Amino acid sequence: MKMLQGVRAFQKLKKSCAYSTAAKELKPLPVKETVNMAYDLHLPERSVIGKMPYHSPEPIVFIHGLFGWKRFYRNDCKTLATALQTPVYAVDMRNHGDTEHAMPFDYNTLMDDLVLLLRKLDIKKVNLIGYSMGGKMSMLTALNYPELVSSACIIDNAPINQPHISPFLKVFSKSCQHVENMKIRATDKEWRSKVAVGLKRYIPNPGIRSYLLQNVSGTPPKKYRSPVIDWNDGNVHFVNPVNHLFQCVVKDASAWPVEQVAGKQFLGPVNFIRGTKSEFVNADGEKAIAEYFPYHKIQSINTTHNVLHERPQEYLRSVIDFFKTTRYVLERKRDSERVTMIAKPKPLTSSQNAAEYS
């Protein structure tokens, strides 16, 4: 069984990653169909109902974007948990943060990792917040596992193939590789400044440089040590396996499995937040959103793709208002269904009637 799973995973890897000569020289990452996603659980700081149960109905799962990390959004998740009186799980996707480094790195694999986590946590129904890559991961999960998803908030992404964002992804990856090749010493007191200068060669936006800089460290993460990053060489490194990801990200992060989800719809409420200066949600994206998610709304915020960092208060207000409204509507719908069931009970079969009165 394990051998069969390994073969399937390797077949997915060959399809998803464009190998180059340089890639073959890299120490390979393990190939795994699923990995255990690291997560942090944020509970409301003040609760109107006393201590919040860990398995509250329909918690929120917050999924970061490319080169993100759950710890970046610790304060955001605490704000959401308290404002919505709901547990919030912030997760790290594979090859990010505290989660294992492994291939493949495509949306179907990321979705499988998320579904595995939900089942391990015994979460029957969830509300998703997904940013960038996390947004596509959330949309795919909602379409393929609608029974697991109550609602979703998608931040600056759309369910389409996006070849037009490939240059953006290439710059991201090249900047990270450039910093790795600089071999900046961890003992250098100015290493953060030198990393910032290295990133500036490809990335003029200071907000994006600051975002990437948070992934660079002079010491290995405490919770996970990558098998392909040499933390003993005395240099600073990205905590992500950037040289491996470069082979996949440009192709797979902009992709969308059109054939797999053809004809599928998610009938729950979905809130899309897009940056007005971003190219991720264009006219084709709006059309696809309407096809896959008929009960949606789109809100624009005056930002680039870096929505969460440029306008944190605006996006949080949008998310909180959406989930509060959605909760109210869904609760009224459920109450109405309960009343209907009581008023019009399902007829018993003759055998059930006999058993009832025997």
Swiss-Prot record:
Residues 59-166 form the AB hydrolase-1 domain. Its main location: mitochondrion. Belongs to the AB hydrolase superfamily. It comes from the Eukaryota. It is found in: Mitochondrion. This is Ethanol acetyltransferase 1. The gene is EAT1. InterPro entries: AB_hydrolase_1, AB_hydrolase_fold. The lineage of its organism: Eukaryota, Fungi, Dikarya, Ascomycota, Saccharomycotina. The keyword Ribonucleoprotein does not apply. Pfam families: Abhydrolase_1 (PF00561). Its EC number is 2.3.1.268, 3.1.2.1, 3.1.1.-. One of its GO terms (cellular component) is mitochondrion. The keyword Iron-sulfur does not apply.
